[in-house]
Structure formats: C-alpha cells, structure tokens
UniProtKB/Swiss-Prot annotation:
Known role: 3'-5' exonuclease degrading single-stranded small RNAs.
Main location: nucleus
Effect of deleting the gene: No visible phenotype; due to the redundancy with other SDN ribonucleases. Simultaneous knockdown of SDN1, SDN2 and SDN3 results in elevated miRNA levels and pleiotropic developmental defects.
Compositional bias annotation for Basic and acidic residues: 595-605
Native organism: Arabidopsis thaliana (Mouse-ear cress)
Name the record gives this protein: Small RNA degrading nuclease 3
One Gene Ontology term of the molecular function aspect: exonuclease activity
Subcellular localization, as worded in the UniProt entry: Nucleus
Length: 782
C-alpha cells in the first residue's frame, strides 16, 4: 500500500483525503486537520486544502490509517483510479493496433452514454472493484470474455434487488446459474418478465457478496465482461469492472437516434437469424447471457456488421415496445432532483394514493430519482393533481411540479414530480415531435429575447416579488450538515438545500421567509459588513461555530437588488458591459494623456497601501490587525472564486508609513510573479490555532524598476546587435559569393559566435539567480 500511495497521482491522493474527510474517518493522529496540527507545527490546519499540500503530506496522512475497513476503502479508491487511467489509455489506442475484441470495448467506452451509466458508487463497502492490471499491452491483448445477465425484483423500500444470475464463457459454457436471496421484503417479483417466483427464492441461500466471490475467479486480469445493458447488471451485482462490451451500445439501427437502442431479441433476429425467446415469454438470464456472447462472437469471429438495417417486422416489434412503454408511462410518475441524503421511505410523503416506488441512487453524491407505479392512469393523474404547486414544463415538454417535502428531522427539501407522458396525447411524444417541440422552444426563447412581451415583464415582476422573500446561502463547505444552517439566520423559514455540483465542492441553500420584511430583518441581523457580489447583489460573509466546535464560513446573499437603486435591467446591463468593453479597447489602442495622468495618480495612491492575500477563510478579519503595525484602515474583499482565501487592502496615511510597516513585518522579502515585493507571515489567532498569509506591496520599488528596465534595455541592445551582425553576414555572403572573400565572412561568423556565447553565459547567470531565489522562497515558506 505504501508504494502504491507514494507513486499515485496528486489528483487521486487529493480525492482520497477529501473522501476520508467527508466520511469523518480518523487515523492514528485523528482526522485531517488534527494530523496537520501534529505533522506541520508551523502552518498546522490553517492550510487544510489537500490540493495545496504536497504528495508527501497527503501520503503521510493516508498511511496513518490502520483499520482493516479503512485500508479496504483506500484500496478500492486506488483501484478505481488505476482502472480509469487505463480506460483513458484504451480510448487513445489507434484502431489498427487493436484486436477485434478490443475494438468492441472501445465502441462501448466511447459511447455518449458510457460515462453516465458506468459511473458507480463503488467506494461503498459492499462493492467489489476488479483489477484491470498494470500493463496496458497485456490487458489489451487479452481475449478472455465472460457474459452475464441478472434478474431483479422490486423491494418494499423501492430499491431493485438481485434474485438470479447467469454467466457463460466464450465457449458458451454455463459457469454460473444461481438464485439470490434478497435482503429486503419483496413487493413485486415481476414474474411475467423475470420468470422468478416466490417459491424459487424460498430455496435461495446465497447473498450478493456470495455471488461476487463466485464471479471473482472468472474476472482475472484483462477479462472482458459482456452483456446487453450491462450497467444495470453491474449495479445490482455491486461490481465495478472497467473492461466491458455492452451490445446495446455496439449494435445500432441505421438512421435511428442513439437513444433508441435495439432489443436483445431483435438483435439476435437480425445478426444471428434466431430469437432469444418468443414474444411475451419470460426472460431466462442464462439464455440472455448466451445471446449477448453470440452477438459479440459474430462480430469478432465472423465480422458481422454492427450497424443494422431493421426489417419491417423489427420496426413493428419496436413500435409495440414503445406503445407498451407509453401505456405503462400513463400509470407512472417520475420524481427527480431528489437530494442524495433524503431517505427513500420519506418519499412516500410527497404523493397520495397507493403506489410502489423504485428508487435509483445517485451516481456520485448528487441527486437521486424514483419511478412511482400506480394501478391505473387515473390514480397517477389524481396523485399529480394533489401535489401543491404550479404546473410547468420540463425541457421535453412534459408536465411537472416542484414539491416541497418536510422530512421527519424538521428540514424541508424540494424535488420535482413529473408525468411520464403528455396530457393532451394518448401516448408519449415521438422523438421527431419532441425535436420539433424543442426547436419551437428555442425559437420562442429567441423571440422573447428580441422582443420582450408584456406577459414576460409581468412574470419577471412576479418572480422578483417572490425572490424578495428569500435569501441565498452559498459557498457552504460540503462537510457542513444541513441542519446546522439553521444557526446562521433567525426567524421562521424553510430551507431548500442544493447539493454540490461536483464531488467535494460547496453546496447552496435557498431560505424562504413568509414576507420580504422578515427576509430583510434576518439579513440585517447577520453580523458583518455588506459587500456586493459580481452581479451587484448585497451579501455578507458569516463565520459561525458548528456543534462539533469547529468554525466555518459561508455567504448570505439577497436574491434581488434593494428597491432604492432599483434592479438593473438586462438591456441596461448589456449596454453597460458593451460600453465597458469599448472603453477598455480604446484605452489599449490609444492611451491618452489623461489616462497616463490617472495611472500616475493611482500609482501614487498605491504607494500608501499594502495587500494582505491568501488569507484563510476561517481567519476573522478583526484578527488581521496583529499582522501590521501603525495607523491604517482595513478593507476586506471576499474571495473572487470558489475557494479558501480572501484578501484585504491596508491603507496608510503616507508611502513612508506603508514602507515602514512592510519593513517591520518579520521575514525575508521575495518577489511574486509580477515582480512585487512580498513576505509570508505566520501568526497565532486568539483561538490558539496558527495561520499564515502574505503581505505584499502594491507597487514596485523605484530601484527595482530601474534595474529591471536597464536589464531589459541591455537585453534588447544585445539582440539588436546580433540581428545587425546576421544581416551584415547575409549581405556579405551574397555580395562576394563569387569573389572568394571568405576571410571577411569568417570574421563576421566569429563575432556572431562570440556574441551568442556571451548571451548564453548571461542566461546561465540569470538561471542561477532564479534558482537561488526559488530556494530562498521555499525556505521561507517552510
């Protein structure tokens, strides 16, 4: 493990540390921040972002974990990272070097739907992550294949459970055919589809973990897993295997959209000339696994085409499938944008009536979804009507409502309830109709932009009035429990939490009050200075304590501009931005005397200032006054991007006071990349923890500027002299090429060589100086 961690990429190590933080795991020296306080006495936990720490620090922390379950988690994450890296290499492999089997693997992993469907929550304890192997050349040449298929039932909590597994090898020999005992009560055996009955499961004794163990011996390094819609099987098996062939991705109908995938039965009819089963017959997972393997062998060994021309019979069968799906859709509703931390049993409070719920878990901590099945279309429509809220359309034109669900914990979350078919049509809209609807929507949006109607203006006003009752919490660290956010604001409100867009990032929350007055009062009661975000909306930075005792910061922002200045219209804002761009362009093209004068004044003003930057967010602004001596004012600036730092400008009465304060800062002055002098400062907070930041001048010292200008001028002179010598040499060679004056040419060449050696020597001196400077900077940081 130590060697694997030491040779791992930085991104993988950072992901590991963030995952450990998210799960609240602790090694021998405690959690991440406790470890930093022990390991790094100087900076401690003030620099807690793993991405800003060296690989050595990250590895040292991960090696403090000794528990078996923690080591297994680290091993799974490491293996997932290694597999992903190898898959990326597979994508870059040139087709002329690959085997026929690898070609089908490449067609699968480069399919548009592969990233979404084959990203699994495989960090969980009950998942098995296979090892692809270290050597790409060995893996890519392996032609060993195993085809699998699974049958699933619906459990009481809405989840899908594995009940039967079939597997065949490349020779079509059955290597596994077992029933699996579900670990939850079953409410729908789907016998007409799966062929599985309650009696079959009474005799079952194997668990999913047992099936994983039985499959492991077939999943040696380089093995290709085959299946039709294989991601569904891997999801219930809880196996993450990277080298796969999905026949629903490899084989396609001619002129059909990628979203329309041919059924296994139709593929076998077209490619193999035989059916897997008669229409209406139940599935048999062993037969389905064998059928998928036969399709792959036909493409690999017989060169069967992967682009299929559907027959009239197939089109009729596909139409029947679509109609059956549409009929089923009438009795269904779809719940989406469900926050990942909402328990599935709580979703029953969203809808009324009798129904079954099939929940699809989130991929990586984002939103989950659920399909709700009713006994009839009438019951589904009644349940949709009973959901409070206005009916809107999703991007496909399907009716949906935004619902607010109050959890047993007292928190309120929002999600969407959507119909599966259109209201005004007996069936789901076709692909072509949907495309036309989307085209009309785009055209309509364009028309609204060009010519805003009175209705649009009225809707905008209504939305603005609604937004006056809301506040927006953003830049909330992902490890802050949502229930702790109630301590940020006072008053009666509901909290709608939005999960982070990316793994380990920040999340947001919308706070809804009963009236604009209550929202304004809550905002006023938040301690801190009011600043503007980049759109001009008022916001405050809040530092508050969690129940664990640690402190975090976030931002509280209004949803609309204050009424006094009035909200800026889109047109006015566009004109302002256009005017600003034009002004900047004009300044660049032809800087006037007035601009030069303004720049000179700004420079004089900047001489009285120092910049404090890279200030950790957990450092209160009032503690910054211990860093600088003298009389000054402090202007705090919130971070410009998602991150961990903020800045502050310190203004003195004169340049002399600013220089004096900078000189009194302990530490060696170094140059940042813009050439400005700065020092790194480590200091103690009143809480006892340590923090560090940088103190930087706002302008270059006069002497340094002069030196830099002279150096640049000297370099320009050398280059100019070299160019002149080269031109003379060319002219001389051309003029006397026929006269044999080689002596003059040799003299010029010698001068040119001497000048080049002189410049090379100067370059070495400059490189040595830079190296010494970097060493000094690294010493001052450590």
């Amino acid at each position: 493990m130590e060697h694997k961690l030491a040779t791992a990429e930085k991104k993988l190590l950072v992901d590991l540390v963030k995952l450990v933080q998210k799960r609240g795991l602790e090694g021998e020296n405690g959690g991440w921040k406790e470890f930093l306080n022990v390991y790094d006495k100087k900076l401690g936990s003030s620099l807690s972002d793993p991405a800003r720490r060296s690989n050595d620090v990250l590895v040292a922390f991960l090696l403090t974990f000794k528990k078996k379950e923690d080591l297994q988690l680290i091993a799974r994450v490491m293996q997932c990272g290694a597999n992903r890296e190898l898959i990326e290499k597979f994508k870059q492999e040139t087709p002329d070097k690959e085997t026929p089997e690898q070609r089908l693997v490449r067609l699968t992993i480069t399919h548009d739907d592969y990233p979404g469907n084959y990203t699994f929550p495989s960090y969980a304890e009950d998942w098995y992550v296979t090892e692809l192997g270290k050597k790409k050349s060995k893996v890519i040449k392996s032609t060993r294949m195993l085809s699998i298929d699974c049958e699933m039932v619906t459990c009481e909590d809405g989840s899908q459970a594995l009940v039967r597994v079939g597997a065949v090898d490349r020779d079509l020999k059955v290597v596994l055919d077992k029933f699996v005992k579900p670990d939850k009560p079953v409410i729908d055996y789907k016998t007409d589809i799966t062929g599985v009955t309650a009696e079959d499961l009474e005799r079952a004794t194997l668990s999913v973990a047992d099936i994983q163990k039985k499959l492991r011996r077939f999943l040696s390094v380089g093995t290709i897993l085959v299946g039709h819609g294989l991601h569904n099987d891997l999801q219930v098996l809880r196996i993450d295997h990277a080298r796969v062939i999905d026949t629903s991705y490899v084989f396609e109908f001619v002129d059909a959209p990628k979203t329309q995938r041919p059924s296994l039965n139709n593929l076998c009819k077209s490619v193999l000339g035989q059916e897997v089963r008669m229409d209406g017959a139940a599935h048999n997972c062993v037969h389905d696994a064998a059928a998928a393997m036969k399709l792959v062998l036909a493409a690999v060994e017989k060169g069967a085409a992967t682009l299929i021309q559907p027959t009239e019979e197939m089109m009729v069968a596909e139409k029947r499938r679509q109609e059956a799906r549409q009929e089923a859709g009438k009795a269904q509703l779809f719940l989406h944008k469900i926050p990942h931390d909402v328990p599935s049993e709580e979703l029953h409070g969203v809808l009324s009536g009798n129904f079954t719920l099939v929940v699809k878990p989130p991929k990586t901590g984002g939103y989950s979804t659920a399909v709700v099945d009713f006994s009839s279309p009438e019951e589904a429509n009644e349940a949709f009507e009973n959901v409070e809220g206005d009916v809107a359309k999703d991007k496909s034109g399907l009716p949906q409502k935004k619902a607010v669900l109050k959890l047993s914990s007292g928190l309120a979350v929002s999600l969407f309830v959507r119909k599966m078919v259109q209201d005004d049509s007996p069936c789901e809209i076709s692909t072509s109709e949907r495309a036309r609807a989307e085209e009309n929507n785009v055209s309509s949006k364009r028309q609204k932009t060009e010519d805003e109607t009175e209705e649009t203006k009225e809707a905008t006003v209504n939305q603005r009035e609604a937004d006056k009752t809301k506040l927006f919490l953003h830049k909330i660290p992902h490890d802050v429990p949502s229930q702790e956010l109630h301590g940020v604001l006072n008053g009666d409100f509901t909290l709608d939490v939005k999960p982070p867009k990316r793994k380990g990032g920040y999340y947001n929350a919308v706070v809804d009050f009963n009236s604009p007055e209550e929202a304004n009062e809550a905002f006023e009661n938040v301690e801190g200075d009011v600043v503007k975000d980049k759109t001009g909306l008022p916001q405050k930075m809040v530092v508050f304590k969690l129940s664990s005792g640690s402190g975090v910061s976030l931002y509280v922002r209004k949803m609309v501009h204050d009424d006094s200045p009035g909200e800026i219209s889109t047109t006015k804002r566009a004109r302002t931005e256009e005017s600003n761009m034009s002004s900047k362009r004009q300044k660049t093209e032809d800087e006037s005397e007035e601009t030069k004068e303004a720049n000179a004044k700004q420079r004089e003003a900047d001489k009285t200032k120092l910049l404090l930057h890279k200030i950790p967010l957990n450092v209160p602004s009032q503690e910054l006054k211990v860093v600088i001596t003298g009389q000054f004012t402090l202007e705090v600036m919130p971070p410009k991007r998602k991150g961990r730092y903020y800045n502050a400008v310190v203004t003195f009465n004169s340049p002399e006071e600013a220089n004096k304060a900078f000189e009194k800062v302990k530490g060696e002055a170094v140059k940042e990349k813009g050439g400005l002098a700065q020092k790194m400062v480590a200091f103690k907070l009143s809480s006892g923890s340590g923090a560090c930041l940088y103190v930087r001048k706002m302008v270059q010292d006069e002497s340094e500027e002069t030196k830099e200008a002279n150096a640049n001028h000297c370099e320009d002179d050398h280059l100019k002299e070299m160019e002149e010598l080269k031109e003379k040499l060319k002219a001389m060679e051309f003029a006397i090429s026929c006269e044999g004056h080689s002596k003059e040419i040799e003299e010029l060449k010698q001068k040119l060589n001497a000048k080049e050696h002189q410049i090379q020597a100067q370059d070495k001196i400059i490189a040595n100086l830079k190296m010494k400077l970097e060493k000094k900077q690294s010493k001052s940081r450590s």
